[in-house]
């Protein structure tokens, strides 16, 4: 097991920077790859760490992250525990593309003054660290099952190792949805009624029918979805029935993933999307198009943080949330204390406050709008109409926390592995694009995909 973990860490070090590049949507619709190039960063320009606090102080407690989101929580913590004000050292590594490489080196160097006592973890790679010896269990910190009882169960599973020992604890929950622009839905789908839209988006056949209807009615100026890439998390984080490899470490292809490849090809061949890649400039521009003078799309896959912070003003009071054909999740950020954490008591205070304490987690929602990983807190937020940091609101009488409050109970993460981030973000999308755009047939695309997975993770086998 130790050899496998070391091999996995090496594979991540070599491939993680590729994940930021993603895969483009194809040839005739080349805008997605162009947007990636425009929005990409120079991989050689590794940013300096931004450090707040004094890491050389004898009682310094060092927390690592890839952005500044945690500073809102840190401000709340300092109010609750004033003694932490001069002790906490916050390190922002400068971006998620650099986080793992930087922190992996420090995890092997506990004598370094920047060694993390606590580290933030994204859901995409949390299992990489949870399955290693680099993290301390919550029970070692004195945090019990009773403390985490109100967390969504899928987040507990994501933060636990193969033996069910929880090492990471999430303050966010991110069940997925489909976000529909009401004005365009009324014009091209003929309704803004949530129940009717739920039916349209309840299965992939009816979604395809709606996509054709929108495309024909708008003369191609409006599409239902921006690109097949926009559907990937629904399939990857909701539709799978088998993992990327079996108990014998043999790489396998889930039938649901083949279905996604076929679905993507249909969308591409029939020109039913703009073939954009998520986060590209062309993808972003479609949110504000009017469908006449400028191109637009009606729906985006989403989740709480996306709804609050990634939709534009065009969508404010103009967004209807519905379920996808399968329940999925997208994101989550959590906390973990490292094995050589300098102060277990401080680590316990932070993790219990940020991920277990109903009242404190409600204050997080008020401060930054996060849909928190505490079912009692969410129930109180809904019942008492608690105002969060975001002023974004939905169409009609829909309520964001209320909509998502029950969706997190149905998320299945039993197939998540430590390798998922690289496979899901880089290797599999390349296979989807190769097949959808006609560069490879299905058998070749799958064969090349399996070979790429093996090349990245040599301990995974192709048969």
Short names for language-model regions:
Residues 98-101, 239-324:
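Extracytoplasmic ligand-binding clamshell segments of periplasmic binding protein
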């Amino acid at each position: 097991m130790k050899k496998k973990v070391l091999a996995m860490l090496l594979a991540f070090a070599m491939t993680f920077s590729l994940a930021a590049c993603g895969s483009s949507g194809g040839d005739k619709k080349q805008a997605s790859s162009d947007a990636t190039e425009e929005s990409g960063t120079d991989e050689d320009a590794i940013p300096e760490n931004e450090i707040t606090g004094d890491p050389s102080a004898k009682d310094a407690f060092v927390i690592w992250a890839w952005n500044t989101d945690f500073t809102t929580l840190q401000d709340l913590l300092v109010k609750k525990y004033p003694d932490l004000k001069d002790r906490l050292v916050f390190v922002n590594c400068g971006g998620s593309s650099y986080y793992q490489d930087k922190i992996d080196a420090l995890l092997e160097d506990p004598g370094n003054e920047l060694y993390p006592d606590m580290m933030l973890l994204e859901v995409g790679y949390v299992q990489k660290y949870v399955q290693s010896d680099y993290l301390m269990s919550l029970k070692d910190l004195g945090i019990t099952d009773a403390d985490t009882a109100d967390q969504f169960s899928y987040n507990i599973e994501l933060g636990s190792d193969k033996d069910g020992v929880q090492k990471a604890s999430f303050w966010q929950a991110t069940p997925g949805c489909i976000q529909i622009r009401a004005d365009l839905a009324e014009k091209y789908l003929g309704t803004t009624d949530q129940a009717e839209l739920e039916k349209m988006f309840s299965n992939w056949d009816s979604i395809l029918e709606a996509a054709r209807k929108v495309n024909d009615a708008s003369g191609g100026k409006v599409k239902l979805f921006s690109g097949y890439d926009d559907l990937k998390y629904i399939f990857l984080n909701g539709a799978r029935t088998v993992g990327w490899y079996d108990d014998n470490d043999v790489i396998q292809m889930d039938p649901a993933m083949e279905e996604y490849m076929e679905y993507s090809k249909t969308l591409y061949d029939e020109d039913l999307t703009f073939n954009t890649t998520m986060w590209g400039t062309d993808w972003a521009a479609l949110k504000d198009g009017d469908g006449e003078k400028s191109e637009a799309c009606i729906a985006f896959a989403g989740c709480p943080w996306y709804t609050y912070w990634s939709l534009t003003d065009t969508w404010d009071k103009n967004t209807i949330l519905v379920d996808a054909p399968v329940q999925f999740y997208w994101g989550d950020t959590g906390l973990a204390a490292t094995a050589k954490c300098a102060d277990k008591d401080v680590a316990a205070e932070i993790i219990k406050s940020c991920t277990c304490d109903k009242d404190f987690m409600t204050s997080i929602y008020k401060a930054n709008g996060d849909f928190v990983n505490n079912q009692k807190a969410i129930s109180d937020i809904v019942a008492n109409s608690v105002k969060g940091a975001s002023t974004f609101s939905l169409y009609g009488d829909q309520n964001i926390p209320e909509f998502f409050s029950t969706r997190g109970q149905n998320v299945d993460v039993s197939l998540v592995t430590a390798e998922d981030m690289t496979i899901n973000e880089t290797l599999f999308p390349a296979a989807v694009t190769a097949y959808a755009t006609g560069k490879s047939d299905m058998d070749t695309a799958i064969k090349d995909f399996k070979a790429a997975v093996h090349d990245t993770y040599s301990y995974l086998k192709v048969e």
